[in-house]
Amino acid sequence: LEQEPLPSMARRAADRVLPSVVRVEGEMARPAPPRAAPRIRPQPGGEELDGSSLGVGTGVVVVDSGLILTNLHVIEGAREVRVTFHTGLESPADIVSLHPDQDLAVLKARRLPDDLQAATLRSSADLGPGDQVVAIGFPFGIGPSVSAGVVSGLEREFRSPKHGRPLARLIQFDAAANPGNSGGPLVTADGEVVGIVTAILNPTSAHTFLGIGFAVPIDSAAAAVGIPPF
């Protein structure tokens, strides 16, 4: 019985980028229920806060001073943002800048691990259909979770049914991604970030993965942080 030698491609890629992946939580304000309304027990996997709800996504450290890339829709409307590093360290995070045209946000953590490692970025210019990629994030808050697939296409366009924002020049991929993966890195077999996972296409009312995911190319995303062109 022939077996692929370990570690696999996906594991090697994940090992390289995982120290740079963070969990992003945004505490969202929500209207208080009517005074007479009964309290509803929070559902499994959720968290109940007084007058707020918790949104969970992913981010990736791109500058070792604590700058983090994530999706705008992960933290949009949040009254407080916090991140959890690979080491387990939790920190409040400030919003540095927002880029609605790319659904991106730049955060800066107030506390940093001693050995913080920024991810290695790689231009997506030489990326092509069939290239192996790995997505890392916190789907449904579980993670960090790793999935692997290939680039399905380039220069895709997508309009969010929730926010209505048109996004262009996206990388299409088939590595599994679900709510909570947003803002996480899409990396090559070498663990180099080529995109920021941003959206999935599901024409049904379900918010689950059907094999079509989209990522903003890191070339565009890096410009939001002020990183020079590759």
Task: Enumerate the predicted regions with their spans.
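Solvent-exposed strand-loop boundary residues in beta-sheet-rich modules
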Residues: 28-30, 87-89, 190
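Terminal peptide-recognition signature
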Residues: 19-24, 59, 66, 70, ...
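Active-site loop architecture of trypsin-fold serine endopeptidases
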Residues: 53, 78-81, 115-116, 136-149, ...
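Alpha-helical membrane and juxtamembrane elements of multi-pass inner-membrane transport
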Residues: 7, 11, 60, 89, ...
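Acidic surface patches and DE-rich sequence motifs
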Residues: 43, 48, 63, 85, ...
